[in-house]
Amino acid sequence: MKTISVKPADVEKKWVVIDAEGAVVGRLAAYVATRLRGKHRPDYTPHVDMGDNIIIVNADKVVFTGKKRDDKRYYHHTGHPGGIKETSPAKILDGRFPERVVEKAVLRMLPKDSPLARQQYSNLRVYAGPDHKHEAQQPEVVDFKSMNSKNTRG
C-alpha cells in the first residue's frame, strides 16, 4: 500500500454549519480545530490545507462547565510596563463581540507560528446570531450536540 500525498489542487473543501447554542466551548473548539486542519479525513496530508470551511452560528449562546464562565480569566498585555489586563468569559459574552470567545478558543487549539495554521484559521466564520451570509455555498449542517452527550449542558 502506498502512502497518499494529496496535492492542493486535488482537495475538495466542504462548507459546514454548526449551531453552537448550548454547546460546551472547549469541546466545540476541539472539534472545529480538527475539522479546520482536515484531520478527520482519511487522506490527511500535514502540509496541505485540507480542512473544511466552517460557519458557527449562535456563538453568543455557548456554555462553560462548572463556574468557568465567571472564574476563568483571559490575560493579555498592552506592551507597556504594568500593562497586564484580564477579563472573564462572562464579560466577553455579555459584551459587544461575544463570538470572540469561540474564535480565540479555536485559534489557541491550532498550531502556533505556522503559516498553514493561519490559512486554516481563515476558513472559520463565527456569528453571534442565528443568521449567516454564506447560503450561496450550500453548507452542510452538522449536529455537533448529538455526537456526544457531554457536548451540551442543561
UniProtKB/Swiss-Prot annotation:
Keywords: Ribonucleoprotein, Ribosomal protein. InterPro entries: Ribosomal_uL13, Ribosomal_uL13_bac-type, Ribosomal_uL13_sf. It comes from the Bacteria. Disulfide bonds: none annotated. GO terms for cellular component: cytosolic large ribosomal subunit. Residues 131-154 are annotated as: Disordered. The keyword Ribonucleoprotein applies. This is Large ribosomal subunit protein uL13. The gene is rplM.
